[in-house]
């Protein structure tokens, strides 16, 4: 099973197994994240019975041996996840109704295709309140100062996220959307307001504005360009975004590759989300 606390050591097969569980497992609602703008439900998703070991909590991240998630996953057949039903989406003036879940899944697809891995495994599936997005729950490292992290200029994963946000045109990158895990890898969450056709980039990660893109970012953008043109990504996005949204994503990738600099803040749109936390 895919281990979010040690993403670098896992394989494509591990991640695919997690995607399969998210898609086909039995979803049980445990609670609600009450501060979220849209209906955001904390769930467990289960298949079969624990493979071995004593009876334990069904949530992988609450395993008895919480410092060894690989051991925990061998003992259990459940993971924690977030389920956001389309029916619980709050209407927005600048995004079509009922499209936020699809945008979250599209953000994961783009992150995975480029090799950034900044979005946890995410799928579209049916659930107790109808279709919606289902995303692996990430237990972030609570010892990390998120405000200090958001201001760093020497964190490769944070810079990857800034480039990713430019590609998907993220209109809501807040500090609280940063999910660092103990091994140093960085995830992000809440990508429902991405992929607008108009330039809506709104983020707390402007520290590289106008700076030359690092080589790793250029290589990731080239991979993404290829996947959009000739790979399965373009076809996969067609069920989640409009053709115009996909085309403007291609244009953003091409523009970044042409100029090879981080974008500047918009002049006709708030550059930082509110509240920024």
Residue spans of the language-model regions?
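Phosphate/dinucleotide-binding and metal-coordinating scaffold of catalytic cores
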Residues: 1-277
């Amino acid at each position: 099973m895919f281990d979010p606390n040690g993403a670098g050591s896992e394989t494509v097969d591990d991640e695919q197994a997690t995607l399969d569980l998210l898609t086909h497992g039995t979803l049980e609602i445990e609670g609600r994240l009450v501060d979220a703008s849209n209906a955001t439900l904390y769930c467990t998703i289960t298949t079969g019975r624990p493979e071995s070991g004593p009876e334990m909590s069904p949530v992988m991240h609450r395993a008895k041996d919480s410092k060894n998630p690989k051991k925990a996953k061998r003992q259990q057949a459940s993971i924690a996840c977030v389920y956001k039903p389309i029916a619980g989406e709050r209407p927005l003036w600048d995004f079509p109704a009922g499209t936020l879940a699809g945008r979250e899944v599209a953000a994961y697809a783009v992150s995975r295709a480029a090799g950034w891995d900044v979005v946890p495994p995410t799928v579209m599936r049916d659930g107790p309140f109808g279709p919606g997005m289902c995303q692996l729950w990430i237990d972030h490292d609570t010892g990390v100062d998120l405000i200090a992290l958001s201001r760093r200029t020497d964190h490769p994963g944070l810079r990857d996220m800034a480039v990713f946000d430019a590609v998907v045109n993220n209109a809501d990158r807040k500090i609280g959307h940063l999910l660092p895990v103990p091994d140093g890898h960085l995830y992000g969450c809440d990508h429902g307001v991405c992929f607008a056709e108009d330039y809506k980039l709104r983020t707390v990660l402007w520290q590289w504005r106008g700076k030359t893109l690092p080589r790793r970012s250029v290589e990731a953008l080239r991979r993404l360009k290829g996947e959009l043109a000739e790979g399965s990504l373009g076809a996969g996005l067609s069920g989640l975004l409009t053709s115009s949204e996909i085309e403007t994503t291609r244009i953003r990738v091409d523009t970044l590759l042409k100029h090879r600099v981080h974008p500047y803040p918009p002049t006709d749109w708030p550059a930082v989300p509110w509240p920024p936390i």
